[in-house]
Swiss-Prot record:
Source organism (scientific name): Eremothecium gossypii (strain ATCC 10895 / CBS 109.51 / FGSC 9923 / NRRL Y-1056) (Yeast)
Subunit structure: Heterodimer consisting of MSH2-MSH3 (MutS beta). Forms a ternary complex with MutL alpha (MLH1-PMS1).
Binding site for ATP: 796-803
Basic and acidic residues composition bias: residue spans: 18-29
Family of the protein in this entry: Belongs to the DNA mismatch repair MutS family. MSH3 subfamily.
Gene this protein is translated from: MSH3
Name listed for the protein in its UniProt record: DNA mismatch repair protein MSH3
Gene3D superfamilies referenced in this protein's UniProt entry, alphabetically: 1.10.1420.10, DNA repair protein MutS, domain I, MutS, connector domain, P-loop containing nucleotide triphosphate hydrolases
Compartments it resides in: Nucleus
Amino acid sequence: MLQQPTISRFFKSSSTRKKSEQRTAKEEAELMQLLESDGENNSATVPSDRKPEAAPMHVGLGNKAAAGGAVPGQVKSATRGFEDFRFNRRREACGKEQEVGFAERLQRIMERREGGCVEEDETELDNEAPRSKRAKPNRLTELDQQFKDLKLQHMDKVLAVRVGYKYKFFAEDAVMVSRVLQIKLVPGKLTVHETDPADHKHKKFAYCTIPDTRLEVHLQRLMHHNLKVGVVEQTETSAVKKNSGTSSSVFSREVTNIFTRATYGINETFGTKDRRVLGDSASVWGLVCKRQPSYTRYFLVSVNLNSGEVIFDDFKEERFLTEALETRIKYTNPSEVVVGDGLGSEIEKVFHTSDSDITLNRIELVGLYEEIFSEPHPAFKGNVPLQTALMLVHGYLTNFKNESLLFFKENFKPFCSKTHMILPSSAIESLDIFENSTDRSSKGSLLWVLDHTRTNYGLRNLKNWIAKPLINIDQIQQRLDAVQCISTEVGNIFIESLNNMLRDGQDLERILNRIAYGKTSRREVYLFLRELTQLATLFSSHHRYIETNVLSANGKIRMQSSLLANIFTDLDEYWKQFPIPNFLAMINIDAALDKNPDRPYVEYFNLTKYDRAEPLISKQQDIEAVIGELRDELKNIRVILKRPMLNYKDEIDFLVEIRNTQVSSVPVDWVKVASTKAVSRFQTPGTAKLVAKLQYHKELLQDLALQEYESFIKRITGEYTSLRKAILHLSTYDCILSLAATSCNVDYVRPKFNTAPQCINVINGRNPIIESLDVRYMPNDVNLNREGKKIMIITGPNMGGKSSYIRQVALLVIMAQIGCYVPAQEAEFSIFDQIFTRIGAYDNLLRNDSTFKIEMTEMVQILRSSTENSLLLLDEVGRGTGTHDGISISYALLRYFIELHNACPLILFITHYASLGSIRSPILGNYHMSYIEEKRPGENWPSVVFLYKLKEGRAHNSYGLNVAKLADIQTGIINRAYKISTMLKQEMESNSSIAAICTIKHALAGNSAASLKSAIETLIESADHEQFVLNM
């Protein structure tokens, strides 16, 4: 039988008697005499049918020894015999009942272990508590009860509770976290309300733990699952608890920080150094919907805490259409949407089925708009629903103490503007603007091609530029001038130094907002001011270059780029006005860089240069005066103890240390505080009063220093508007620098713009994304304009490059209108106000949308929103339904656009319906991606070699079997498919010809000209290599 050390303590120690220890008759008689005498002295009564249980031997022996009637040898022998007798009598009395009781007790302990009530590393809990301290069966431990109390106040959050050097998650939080983090879950109660059927089997909550050093990593993993996590910290130390006299209870705890994906980056306290901060682009929405029978009106306020940007919008959309709402989701990337009333099932589906993981939060409004926002933004005046949306965001951010951002009016801006276009969500998705459609990473996207930014705030601004291309030709030319100028000046020492400083710098925009929220650390404030000071120093050290090339009317930069000249001029003036170096000089560098958060605030300031140091210095002088009194008290102590070299043990508690051999010379009114084997430490009545007085002044100094630090932060926040403007200038410069780096690629050319509408003339244009992936790309021309072709019907084999070609055209337009060079030999564009796409086939099962329904919904949006200055990319419209219906829809759409004449937008139309190529119109042209057919042994179908070159004319085959071959489908299967395809094609041609001949016969018999014309047209359409002339 295996030994169980944790259970063996329940066995009472006893030894087996040897035969040599058997009692003699004389010893039995002596023992019985002792029992009789013990029974007389025992006050307890026993039943008459059993002998009295012997009292402890030392009592009886003590009586005999006092009477002088016992000798040592007899006492020892009698004691041993008495113990043996008691053991045997008790064993006989208990018998098997004792064994059964022990077995039951052991079973209960093992059940507690299996139920999680006894932890494997807490073996002392195996011992059952005395009856006086044993808890009630269903009573929670103090820690579990504390968690329950906190959880009931924060049911919408996952609570991470600090317990020593770990963080614990309990109950339903533990179940969720253990699944996300893939860590062990210790069994226990699974719900805080104890509603789970198995909860009654356990006395403690289920839990899982993580080390405190890994909290940041695990928090980010939880944030990726869009969980709201509250961090519960201990609000008292063991020393404070000991002094408070409550050391037996649990530490007091409270929720000290709350994290969500949108608020993590602005509220985190880990000092992350990553360039890409979690939730950097995520936002919080306040949304109000007003539903009408025919449309829904939306009132939106979107807040990005990291950038400080507050976007507001008021728009309406027809019922059952959500393109405009989805577009705003793509732009602002909300992770949390705050609403007051219900949105309706259709609108909620949009959030639940979007690519972003969005959480809906319903809150009740508290207070009035006029009471909270005394100076409202002009756009909110009179718009009550929009005010309500702002109030919803304010109420939600108040929980995180981030609402101060909403009081800076310069952060507000409308979603729509007359200076830029808004790319629809379908275009952002199908053109791979921010992420590729394969693995959703940034590689393989337009952002990946253009992103050479050096700062986080520059990257955020670049995303905004890409998503909202300019539609003002003067602003586009200004950006192109700046890109060209910076490309020629990149070797200048001032430009190079500025570029390096931005690359190695902090996220100034994020830190500025953290300062405004009061969430920053002392170290972060110092680094923020230091970088701004370095920028100011850079501009002042190159003042001659700036005066000559920027400020002068004939300066090289001012002559080449008014945008760059304005940026450098504003920054130069700002650095001269704002006293950043003075602020930095007020900080003690050693204390600022110290990572110890408990370091006194007074040490953060350099009091010799701090302009408000008088109260702090005065309080320090009070402390020095008390320390002087303590030194005088030390002189008196030396005299009393006759030890002239005596000093205090330390200058914290000011204790007097004396050897234990000399304690007798200590006055009686001294208080012993601590002692060791060698020494004892005392506090005199005088030092006790002075130490209390010293502590009082130190606390006053700490409070005063904290007030001065908060005042110092407010002085920086008071410059928020000017600082934000300067940082925006730096982000604009960073974006220009990024576009300049892209424009320096080989064979990139500056695009030209003309005021004439509807023009795309590109020679040897290339797809920038595919080319950047080190794939050899065949250049192609584009020629669309008002005088020539406005519609291109593009046919050709599958995988021939049709979709890549039309995407290339859209990407070139976007790059040109954000002010970047394009990959082409020559490029000329007009200004486009919208880019619409209908590319790809996909469904949405969660919203009950089939592939064809999505196609038609997108086409409705395009037909209603497009103008003559729009660019349309239509890829295989009608593919989601039957062939005949698909052809009919495509034909009807083309005829609709052709009939618009001059109001027709520029269209690139991909199709596999060869009959559509028979349509002729002055504004329509047929093109195909060229290829070469070749015959291979063992293959009945023609193989295709792709040339990826656009040519005029239409293709008569899609060569789908060739794609099947590329996918490694067996040759026999493809041969059979080719045979069936040929038979079906011949059958369709035969049926069409017979029907047409019959129609002609009847028409000739009836002399009907209309019927004859219809029959002839049907016959001609049945021939693949004939052309159908449509009289438009």
